[in-house]
């Protein structure tokens, strides 16, 4: 099971999210309306992404320093922590609502304000997104993005700055 997490984007795109992927047996990406994430199969070179990279900026995740193909430009590079929850902690859950398509404009505004990571026009369609509202206003949210056999990525975890420190993000996760 952990081997799937060694190349999580590929595992999702060639597994449970194959229906959302574009590409072939060497390289796949999500439709840019969902996210910019892309991956290559184990052992494949990043140049395998050339054909599908033309659809727009891509984001990759690697376990080692990648060899960047000639002509590519790195726009941003940062470390990512991958965590796995083996046991849920007993705690009182906050009162939350399930977010729907009608909530996307408000979700997008919260993401723009807090910058938890990529959130495209159709990201909400990856899975269930839940949120906390205060007097009708969306103040915190979290949702599912990549799905890998036995694992769901928790994504877009964010809380409006005026509501931070109340445990909303922890409760939603």
Residue ranges and their predicted role:
Residues 1-67:
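N-terminal charged segments
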Residues 2-3, 79, 86-117:
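Short amphipathic alpha-helix that is part of the acyltransferase structural core
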Residues 39, 82-85, 131-133:
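Short, well-ordered beta-strand micro-motif
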Residues 39-41, 102, 157-165:
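A short, internal acetyl-CoA/4′-phosphopantetheine-binding micro-motif in the GNAT/acyltransferase core
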Residues 46-50, 165-173:
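Conserved acetyl-CoA-binding loop-helix of GNAT-fold acetyltransferases
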Residues 59-93:
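A glycine-rich, hydrophobic loop/mini-helix early in the fold
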Residues 118-128, 132-161:
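A conserved beta-strand-loop-helix scaffold within acyl/acetyltransferase catalytic domains
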């Amino acid at each position: 099971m952990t081997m799937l997490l060694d190349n999580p984007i590929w595992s999702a795109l060639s597994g449970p999210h194959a229906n959302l992927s574009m590409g072939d047996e060497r390289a796949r990406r999500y439709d840019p309306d969902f996210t910019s994430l892309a991956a290559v199969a184990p052992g494949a070179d990043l140049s395998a992404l050339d054909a599908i990279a033309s659809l727009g900026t891509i984001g990759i995740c690697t376990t080692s320093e990648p060899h960047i193909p000639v002509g590519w430009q790195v726009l941003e590079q940062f470390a990512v922590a991958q965590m796995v929850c083996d046991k849920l902690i007993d705690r009182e859950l906050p009162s939350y609502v399930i977010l729907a398509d009608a909530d996307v404009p408000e979700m997008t505004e919260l993401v723009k304000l807090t910058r938890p990571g990529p959130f495209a026009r159709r990201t909400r369609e990856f899975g269930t997104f839940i949120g906390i509202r205060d007097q009708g206003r969306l103040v915190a949210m979290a949702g599912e993005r990549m799905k890998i056999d036995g694992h769901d990525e928790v994504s877009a975890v964010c809380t409006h700055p005026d509501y931070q420190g109340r445990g909303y993000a922890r409760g939603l996760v």
